[in-house]
């Protein structure tokens, strides 16, 4: 599970970036990717995440857009974890591999249709619980596979 790229996309909250890092690094994810961070997420969230990563011997990558992350990382598959209203299928945790990019949307509006075309849209639970809730459940389920 350490090789898997976990991404927070389209966030404006420094606190969300920090908590995302705590959860992901807590599950021994080696590299966190952040794309399209704005406002306090970019100004103070990313520096806080870098500090956390350095102290833990982990990595953080920051890209302007999701396309940049896909171009550089070259994942085998891209999973966009959203809510049921925009994603057709429930996550099958067995289809997620070590070299995949798993993207969680930090904005309450979710992914746009254009963003969903970049990968496989999946949902975890029936109701909207946000990026942090989805991340925690996702990583817990993935940790059971090991």
Swiss-Prot record:
GO terms (BP aspect): DNA restriction-modification system
Stated role: A putative type II restriction enzyme, its methylase would be M.MjaORF1200P (AC Q58600).
Organism: Methanocaldococcus jannaschii (strain ATCC 43067 / DSM 2661 / JAL-1 / JCM 10045 / NBRC 100440) (Methanococcus jannaschii)
Keyword DNA-binding on entry: yes
Enzyme Commission number: 3.1.21.4
InterPro entries: DUF2122_RecB-nuclease-rel (IPR018665)
Keyword tags: DNA-binding, Endonuclease, Hydrolase, Nuclease, Restriction system
Name of this protein: Putative type II restriction enzyme MjaORF1200P
Catalysis: reaction(s): Endonucleolytic cleavage of DNA to give specific double-stranded fragments with terminal 5'-phosphates
Gene Ontology terms, MF aspect: DNA binding; endonuclease activity
Family: To A.pernix APE2001.
Domain of life per record: Archaea
